[in-house]
Amino acid sequence: MNTELKILMAGVDEVGRGPLAGAVVTAAVILKKPIDGLTDSKKLSPKQRNLLAIRIKEEALAFAYGRAEVEEIDQLNIHHATLLAMRRAVEALPIQPDNVVVDGAFTPQLNIPCKAIVQGDSLIPEISAASILAKVLRDEEMVALDKIYPGYGFAEHKGYATPVHKEALMRLGPCKIHRRSYSPVADLISK
């Protein structure tokens, strides 16, 4: 009889701190076993991310998403909104982990032990998996929002401050999903 207890660790990461538009999206993942190919989502091609996201969803013991909407980002600031989204992801897990590891330097307020790990998305498989799930979901959302708010190019730049996006902002003005507290959006509104 195996009396060894498995410690359940959830990895958490965010996507979308820097863009001028859209929500910040987080994921929390508890892995059953290692999955080959996991690394920081930014180091993977879209095709690799999509394939790994399917495997993570199939093979993980549990996963969940959290988010903070544009209004929350503008009201709280991106730092606090990100921590809120991380907490929401952990609380949405169908299984409570024994501890949580988060990519970055700060941890959300949780009732379970939590540790921040700088560059954790490259070092800890659970955080890598969370990074991939969050990135795939947010990218899909921005492609869908591109159809609702045409002309900004959200499907291509995902809301980041590219020259194309800045030019569209100047031409069209901000839409509902633009972060009013972010420059150059705030600069446009104040003119």
Curated annotation (Swiss-Prot):
Molecular function terms, GO-annotated: manganese ion binding; RNA binding; RNA-DNA hybrid ribonuclease activity
Reactions that this protein is recorded to catalyse: Endonucleolytic cleavage to 5'-phosphomonoester
Pfam families: RNase_HII
First-listed, main subcellular location of the protein, grouped into a coarse class: cytoplasm
Subcellular location per the Swiss-Prot or TrEMBL entry: Cytoplasm
Keyword Heme applies: no
Entry's cofactor comment: Manganese or magnesium. Binds 1 divalent metal ion per monomer in the absence of substrate. May bind a second metal ion after substrate binding.
Gene Ontology BP terms: DNA replication, removal of RNA primer; mismatch repair
One Gene Ontology term, aspect cellular component: cytoplasm
Keywords: Cytoplasm, Endonuclease, Hydrolase, Manganese, Metal-binding, Nuclease
E.C. number(s) listed in UniProt: 3.1.26.4
Required cofactor names: Mn(2+); Mg(2+)
Enzyme class per UniProt: hydrolase
Residue stretches making up the RNase H type-2 domain: 7-191
Domain of life: Bacteria
Sequence positions that bind a divalent metal cation: 13-14, 103
NCBIfam families tied to this protein: PRK00015.1-3, PRK00015.1-4
Known role: Endonuclease that specifically degrades the RNA of RNA-DNA hybrids.
Family that this chain belongs to: Belongs to the RNase HII family.
Entry-linked HAMAP family: RNase_HII_B
Protein name as catalogued: Ribonuclease HII
Organism expressing this protein natively: Legionella pneumophila (strain Paris)
